[in-house]
Each structure stands twice: as C-alpha cells, then as structure tokens.
Amino acid sequence: QVLRSVLLFPTIERMAQSPQGKLMTPLLCKLRYALYMPVYLLSFLPEGVKASLVRFALRGMKTCDESSITTSINLFSVDCIANILYMASQEMIKVVERDSTTIKQNLKKLIFYYGTGDSWCPQQYYDEIKMDFPDGDIRLCEKGLRHAFVLDASKEMAAMITDWLQDDLTKL
C-alpha cells in the first residue's frame, strides 16, 4: 500500500519543449553516438585519474559527497553511457502530456515539488498544474535547490522530505 509519493522536480510532461529539452533533444536523439568513442577511450584510464576528472567536473558544487564521485565514475563505461543516453532520448520522445487522470485519481497521495529555476520543468509547469489541481499538495522550492539536487543538496532534501512525511511515518 502506497501512503505517499513525492515527485521532486517532476519531469512528467513536455520534456522536449522545456528549455533544457530544446537543447538536449537533438543531441540525445541524433548525436549521442558521437560520445561512445571518447567514452570508450576514457574507460581505459586508471580509477584515480577518472576520480580526479570527476572532481574537476564537479568542482563548482558547494558540497560534493564522495558517493557522488564514486557513482559518477560509472559514466566512463560505454554500456552505462549508451543506456543513459538511449533512455534520455526516449524520455524526450515519449514524455509529452501530463497524465492528469492518474494524478486526479491519486491526488491525496501525491506531493509535487517544483523548482523556481528548473530548466527541465519550468515554473510555468508548476503554475499550470497548481491551477488544474488547486487542492493538490503542489509546492514551489523556496530554497534555490536545483534539479540535480543529489549532487550537492541530498541531505537538505532528505531532511525536508522527512518533515513532510512525518505524519505518514507515524502510521507505519
């Protein structure tokens, strides 16, 4: 039995039409194959060099967990990159219309959390779903968290969600 479902920065509609989608759709659908050879060549680097490259790429993060670095090293695998890019290309093609029927059927169990500067699901999407479902638990981030919060704000997000779900957790 599902008590609650939390949709964080939900990419549930019009992905290819979002600002980031307009940029990424051609790359993901047509040019993704061009990345396979460079990734294949980088896969031969020693693990320490890969970790250094990841740290360099993530240097702008305010905090970066060692787990983010360890996980990001998987991006040097051709199989991993091929699967990621294929899945992302399919999302651009298939995630088009919001499933309002399913949302309406489960509205009392859903929490939506939208970002103010999210280029994957812009604030316009928040405004529209809030208008369509005024009784829903649909929130707009006031903390400036970004879509890729797992890279630098996972603890902050976890604490926030724990607060939201406190009543549900006492029922278990």
Residue ranges and their predicted role:
Residues 12-14, 117-119, 146-147:
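Short, solvent-exposed loop/turn segments at secondary-structure junctions
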Residues 44-86, 97-98:
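Conserved alpha/beta-hydrolase catalytic His-Asp/Glu region
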Residues 108, 127, 131-172:
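Catalytic active-site module of serine/aspartate enzymes centered on a nucleophile-bearing elbow/loop
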Residues 25-56:
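Membrane-proximal basic amphipathic "stem/tether" segments
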Residues 29-36, 101-105, 163-172:
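Eukaryotic N-terminal low-complexity, Ser/Thr- and Lys/Arg-rich leader segments
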